[in-house]
Amino acid sequence: MPSTNRAGSLKDPEIAELFFKEDPEKLFTDLREIGHGSFGAVYFARDVRTNEVVAIKKMSYSGKQSTEKWQDIIKEVKFLQRIKHPNSIEYKGCYLREHTAWLVMEYCLGSASDLLEVHKKPLQEVEIAAITHGALQGLAYLHSHTMIHRDIKAGNILLTEPGQVKLADFGSASMASPANSFVGTPYWMAPEVILAMDEGQYDGKVDVWSLGITCIELAERKPPLFNMNAMSALYHIAQNESPTLQSNEWSDYFRNFVDSCLQKIPQDRPTSEELLKHMFVLRERPETVLIDLIQRTKDAVRELDNLQYRKMKKLLFQEAHNGPAVEAQEEEEEQDHGGGRTGTVNSVGSNQSIPSMSISASSQSSSVNSLPDASDDKSELDMMEGDHTVMSNSSVIHLKPEEENYQEEGDPRTRASAPQSPPQVSRHKSHYRNREHFATIRTASLVTRQMQEHEQDSELREQMSGYKRMRRQHQKQLMTLENKLKAEMDEHRLRLDKDLETQRNNFAAEMEKLIKKHQASMEKEAKVMANEEKKFQQHIQAQQKKELNSFLESQKREYKLRKEQLKEELNENQSTPKKEKQEWLSKQKENIQHFQAEEEANLLRRQRQYLELECRRFKRRMLLGRHNLEQDLVREELNKRQTQKDLEHAMLLRQHESMQELEFRHLNTIQKMRCELIRLQHQTELTNQLEYNKRRERELRRKHVMEVRQQPKSLKSKELQIKKQFQDTCKIQTRQYKALRNHLLETTPKSEHKAVLKRLKEEQTRKLAILAEQYDHSINEMLSTQALRLDEAQEAECQVLKMQLQQELELLNAYQSKIKMQAEAQHDRELRELEQRVSLRRALLEQKIEEEMLALQNERTERIRSLLERQAREIEAFDSESMRLGFSNMVLSNLSPEAFSHSYPGASSWSHNPTGGSGPHWGHPMGGTPQAWGHPMQGGPQPWGHPSGPMQGVPRGSSIGVRNSPQALRRTASGGRTEQGMSRSTSVTSQISNGSHMSYT
């Protein structure tokens, strides 16, 4: 365990600054116990520095649950430091000494429950309204700062000398709202606090409920169900209707106020701010109503203490003169005065207060008022002496000197016996005089009885404390499990998010790599095409040069041949003059040379036109090939994106299934834990109830045994009474016998005296025998009657107790059944809510997937459309330039058949079919040109899937050869077989709508 959590550890600076470092025993003197509870005790004390009267609440944090006690002390100190309001107790500081915290607060006269204890009757409605108004103002302050008191009752509402109402005992308070802890005092608990762990959280309205119960307490001297076992009261409050005021003497305003506070459903219950506007507290009332009540209470306390004082003086006086004697009369008198207090709200109920550090119902004597300080040293010494007397006698007697004089003057017997009183009486007088600054509305007998009850009811208090501790532990276990599962869920969610992010990053890297690869492919293809075009031009130029050389050689041969023929013709014709022959021959030579020059020029022109045409046609084929490559790359990229998106969606669905499985497993774990905790709680409740039943039966048996033990004494007394009556009867008969004997002896002759005496003796013996028989009969009848009456009374008490305990057990069973049903309903509701959340999340995920698929489809369509439009613009621009240069589109659309019959040296195979593309694009067969993808060319060859004409049989990737012959050029130029291409002005939109968009594979 960390040192900062160890009880009493001040290593944490935040905790250390909560406590003062001084020794409290040197700062505070004249300590006198004025209250006692489960936490410890409250003392009256005086601050030696300021001579100010204070109240000190001592809380030990040693022994069992020391860490829990220490945490409660820290929480209460922090709470007291935060609150500053006229209707809340003023905090002065906290000190530590020997594993005990000294919580110093302002001193108050007493609590509202002390008023009930002293007066033995309910308060007046106007007094209840004044007390309630002050308490409401304090609660409104707490609730406005999101704090909850959680232990409102008459014992925790204190009064000061000026009549101010103060809220005290914040050991159960919560600094956060809403809360869900099981704390408070059973009879004042709101239903939602009792069901806190089962049904969820609660807020400041629990204090409003407790205030309503407190109003009933002040109006009826005890809260509802106070005659019931505290545990049974919890079950009763949780499932039965709200209590109401029983008497009809209260006003409608008061009844409505109580009914509003005790609304079973918290949402229907008003807040403390709203209750401050209620007519019950706003009605006009005397300003001095509480001051007058306090004064009357102080007078009554003085009278009660004076009565006890006179008894003690009388007892001491008789002991001094007569020795020990049985004061039966005084015992009866004491019973008359003290017996009526047992029905009030005493510390038994308060000691059942749930928080271990809370002040009990009648021990709240720590509050505001600072009384006049002592003026002389003698008074201080007297007070120290008085303190010693009080602590040794475990009692508190409150009497001022003038009060003592007043009571002595009013009691002649006391005044007459005062000079003869022993030293003890003098010490008691000195003791009373020393308390002149100790004002209170609590009687000495109340403090003494409270201490005794605290010692006697330890078993019941320990049972309630154990139950409270169990509820706390269960709540802590549940919160620990929920936090653990939440951490597991967060970790799982982070892991899934990380996996998804990793996959997306991998996909992005793959896509970037693919795009770079495509860019490299395009660059490489551009270089290859440039080289191919250069080689193609060089090949044609080489062939044309070769053809030109051949042509020139043939012209030379033809020239020589023609020259020889002409010479032969001239030689045959001898009649022609030689000069004429020479001229004719020269002219023929010139004609031949001119014709050959024209033929050469025509050849060069045709070669140039052919070169330009074939280069232009080659460039168009290159452009179409690049377009096909772009289409293939775009198709590959889009298919890759589609594949990645499918994989991402599959992962999202798997993650959804994984999250769903984990959520259902967590919910099942929490519900199992909750069921187990409810089972343990119900088992503990049943065990506690059975122990309570056994204890009640044991107490009743003990009482009956005591009655049986006391019966011989009462029987002996009655037997002595009967015996006395018999003796009186015997004496009467003896006197009558003597009188009759004397009379008969006087009236009868002396000779008959013997017979008369004998007869009288027999008669007397017979009557005495009859009287003895009657005596025995009376004794036996009395014994049997008394025994029967005792048996019947005890049997009746046993039956009543059994019925009561059976009802409480049935109430517990009903409560537990209700809790189980509520838990099952809650589990079903949680399961339905989780299923709804999962279904909604699945629907949102599917909607997101559908939207992403639609967006991807739109992106694919847009990419294809933009690519087709760009390629169409490029082809159209190329064809326009060709038309400007004088080339026909039909001529450029297809190579001549002869062009495929030869290949130039060094020509490489194209990676794409320049005439028909690379097969089906976007899921449809392509035509010979990309003008209209997926449609046959009008007037031209069939699509690649149905080749025809001279193009049939050309393999993919075959080299393109061009037959360099004027005949081919002439045939092409003269309108030989050509293929009509489709115009590039065909609408791209119609192409896409007709099926040229992607077909996802």
Swiss-Prot record:
Active-site feature positions: 151 (proton acceptor)
List the source organism. Rattus norvegicus
CDD domains found in the cross-reference section: STKc_TAO1
* Record PTM Phosphoserine, positions in chain: 9, 421, 445, 965
Q: Where in the cell is it found?
A: Cytoplasm
Sequence ranges assigned to domain Protein kinase in this UniProt record: 28-281
UniProt key word Thylakoid: no
InterPro entries (UniProt xref): Kinase-like_dom_sf (IPR011009), Prot_kinase_dom (IPR000719), Protein_kinase_ATP_BS (IPR017441), Ser/Thr_kinase_AS (IPR008271), TAO_STE20_kinase (IPR051234)
* Family membership: Belongs to the protein kinase superfamily. STE Ser/Thr protein kinase family. STE20 subfamily.
Whether Cytoplasm counts among this entry's keywords is yes
Q: What is the protein's given name?
A: Serine/threonine-protein kinase TAO1
Q: Name one GO cellular component term.
A: cytoplasm
Q: What is its EC number?
A: 2.7.11.1
Report activity regulation.
Serine/threonine-protein kinase activity is inhibited by SPRED1.
Q: Where does ATP bind?
A: 34-42, 57
